[in-house]
Amino acid sequence: MNPFFEPYNTPHDTVPFDRIRLEDFEEAFMEGIRRDNEQIEKTINNPEKPTFDNTIINTEEDKGYYDLLSRVSTVFFNLLSAETNDEMDALAQKMQPILTQHANDVRLNPRLFERIRQVHLHHRKLTPEEKMLLDNCYEGFVRSGALLDEAGKERLRQLTEEASMLSLQFSQNLLKEQKAFTLDITDEAQLDGLPETAREAAALTAKEQGKQGWVFTLDMPSYSPFMTYSTQRELRKQLYMARNTICTHDNAENNIEICKRLINLRREIAQLLGYKTYADYVLKRRMASNTRGVYRLLNDLIDAYKPTAQKEREELKKLFDKSLTSNPSPLTSKMMPWDSGFYSHKLQMKKYNIDQEMLRPYFELSKVIEGVFGLANKLYGITFKENKDIPVYHPDVKAYEVFDKDGSYLAVFYADFHPRKGKQGGAWMTEYQGQQWEIKDEKLRIKNVRPHVGVVMNLTKPTEDKPALLTLGEVETFLHEFGHSLHGMFANTRFESLSGTNVWWDFVELPSQFMENYSVEKDFLRTFAFHYQTGEPLPDELIDRIVKSRNFMAATACLRQVSFGLLDMAYYTQREEFTEDIIPFEKQAWKKAILGEQLPDTCMTVQFSHIMAGGYAAGYYSYKWAEVLDADAFSVFKKHGIFNQETAQRFRDEVLSKGGTEHPMTLYKRFRGGEPTIDALLKRNGIKAPKSHKPSKSH
């Protein structure tokens, strides 16, 4: 029998990956749609007066874990990012329009919406969480076109179905292009400057691909060390241009027209729903409220960070010019983008005598896992135990049971660490089962259904004779995604659609970026950073250098993120049809946050998954917004102790466990005692506030 049609009978009802076949998905999708439609018919044909219980609860259950369509969709689309193949891609192309049509059928059903509207108008005696669910349900239908006339609804169907297909095509094109390129080296002299770990990894990749020598790819664990350490400027340029021109070539994977069409589709959707721009539509349900709030934040950051970033660039350029004088290059004498990583490393060594390779031996993955889990234990008292009886979708994946401080079961946690064929680049948190209370009609809390969450990353792989040795940056990435996972694990709400990370998108990055702070905390590093061969702890002098170098090129990094935010807003504040050429438009859109050379052929937009296919359209500013929040929140821990359990418990109770049950600023203020200011972020980064700056609330 199709495993989606029967009880899983696995530990904690985890997904039976070992029993799922490709053909099971389509069958389960179609049966899920049939059951959904059947349930909706029951709801709208109910002769009783619409109530919260017989209408809103039913609608909530139609998209929860116990709903077949939700279950199969969750598994399929998670695997499409983490473990796909040509057959999965083809099925996605087939199912996407069917699923989008079904979603439209639900949200544009006039009889269902009328019942929801009646409850919204006449509800009584709801708890705050029930009221939030009702408001979200009503708003969700309105924002999906429920108030449009028939012609408007039909047009909206066309737009959303096309947008969903193009988003999928964008992602599939990007993955194909990223995996297609390799830099093959057979002359060992061309490896000059590369550390042993990078050489060994490249040799292993070559062996896996049946090639001689060394193979470098566009996956970050391969790309980043090459750009940082290789003395071969020509090869750095080749690799840089390969990465930064993907999906711009004259082939089937070109994303330029897809991006233009997505921008226009989203603008038209927003205008059809009564908004001037897509950004206005998105920001209606964000802490930032409107485009003014977003631009105010981005411009404040430019004012604060740009002077320091200019100094950082001048310092880098001096080192480049000095190096070029003693070692002339056949390429241009200007510092180019493919030089930045190489000379940043040299400058960091000169100023702090520290680099990522120096630290790798102390960041063996198994020890890092112990450290991250240990941090969660110190803060919240939770423990992790690997359970090999829990099915996984790839041998690389580990599954853990998570137990609360009282020993009770809390969650299942999956960890998928390394790059491989069929896996998207980057890092993300995922969820296979959301938390909710399983209740009966009398509203008794019967069972707290616990979440199944995980992290999917592309960290350095082990080699034939070495374990996986991470960079400090990869440790930070792990902490970031683990922070999202804690948000999911600690969820304690009645309704799944309000639990865990189901919050406004400019709040969702707070728990993740908060955890990044620990990557440069001495007392945390001392808990797990031991040499993988000798067992010696990371020397105090190295830890001191890590802490001192924390803000190295911080202003440049900030402007880079701001530039992405500006680009995002430039696309989604369009009021008329977007017809411009993507590449030159991009260069102009982020110009005031870019200090270096802009190359005419490179393009970020065509690989900018966040804003084209990842849900961050008109929302990329969220990363900097959340950074203001996380710096402010972590200052409380710095004051009371970074492992202070009382503070951690308040953070868990007031923020992490609440999900989207209240307005995010209400939750934050309850924890912090007031609204955040940008000041803590400036202080953390060692940035002097501009003269015009006054301590201000986050926007």
What would you call each of these model-derived segments?
Residues 460-479:
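Short pre-active-site segment immediately N-terminal to the catalytic Zn-binding motif
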Residues 5-13, 42-46, 139-144, 352-354, ...:
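Short, charged/polar, low-complexity loop and linker segments
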Residues 129, 133-134, 172, 176-217, ...:
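Active-site-proximal, well-structured secondary-structure segments within enzyme catalytic domains
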Residues 1-21, 27, 31, 213-215, ...:
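C-terminal, non-catalytic "cap/extension" segments appended to globular domains
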Residues 1-31, 35-36, 81, 88-289, ...:
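His/Asp/Glu-rich acidic catalytic environments and adjacent acidic regulatory segments
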Residues 67-75, 135, 139, 340-348, ...:
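Short, hydrophobic/amphipathic alpha-helical patches that form generic packing surfaces
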Residues 33-125, 559-571, 575-591, 598, ...:
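C-terminal non-catalytic alpha-helical accessory regions
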Residues 17-28, 52-59, 251-255, 294-298, ...:
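Membrane-entry segments of alpha-helical transmembrane domains in multi-pass membrane proteins
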